[in-house]
Amino acid sequence: MNTYAQESKLRLKTKIGADGRCVIEDNFFTPPFKLMAPFYPKDDLAEIMLLAVSPGLMKGDVQDVQLNIGPNCKLRITSQSFEKIHNTEDGFASRDMHIVVGENAFLDFAPFPLIPFENAHFKGNTTISLHSSSQLLYSEIIVAGRVARNELFKFNRLHTKISILQDEKPIYYDNTILDPKTTDMNNMCMFDGYTHYLNLVLVNCPIELSSVRECIEESEGVDGAVSEIASSHLCVKALAKGSEPLLHLREKIARLTTQTITQKI
């Protein structure tokens, strides 16, 4: 049963406003979701923060998020704080997210890390539909648990799926299953002693693989790599023993990308 009286829903649709910048065309949300009004930290790049007025996800919580980024919009979406998945007892919490990025639009989706508490069970499914000219930075950071309490990999199960389509053709699929009951999370093929994991996908972004690799190599305390996926798009996987190194790495890559995207003609 959902903690709230109904399924938690968030709808956001953007367009280009009269001043040529990205604005909110339409939005709708139910508890605990809220939206901050967009602000413009750089040129025509808008930033919108998604708010969740709650202590975190509980047993039975169901979230349905739909984001429609209009043509020519340049938008960065962030979250309010680290997301906590509490003890879900014998159930689970879930989120289904659908994102559409329109023609010549740019989306940088940069939420804070996800922290599964002891006995937490979370299912996440994200589908992103792109136009051939859309540009995307999408990331997730997963934490081993409440690291400061030495609560490492005590969660029940965490399963996230990311599907990216370009002109209705699949170009990327990620199926992350973390199940400490059946897998040694400290195995060298898993976290290998690290506690934080970054997954970052870049589609049609004006940054070279060599530049991303250089960012990774210059990041202290980070063990990671970048790969070229379908049609020369990029995927970064990285591990660290804290959130800050991964957040800094992600920000460095995003900054290099947006420097080109937001340049005035």
Swiss-Prot record:
TM segment ranges: none
Subunit structure: UreH, UreF and UreG form a complex that acts as a GTP-hydrolysis-dependent molecular chaperone, activating the urease apoprotein by helping to assemble the nickel containing metallocenter of UreC. The UreE protein probably delivers the nickel.
InterPro entries: UreD
Keyword Cytoplasm: yes
Protein name listed in UniProt: Urease accessory protein UreH
PANTHER family: UREASE ACCESSORY PROTEIN D
GO-annotated molecular function: nickel cation binding
Principal place of residence: cytoplasm
Cell compartment(s), UniProt: Cytoplasm
Organism of provenance: Helicobacter pylori (strain G27)
One GO cellular component term: cytoplasm
Keywords assigned: Chaperone, Cytoplasm, Nickel insertion
Pfam families per the UniProt record, alphabetical: UreD
Family assignment from sequence similarity: Belongs to the UreD family.
Function of the molecule: Required for maturation of urease via the functional incorporation of the urease nickel metallocenter.
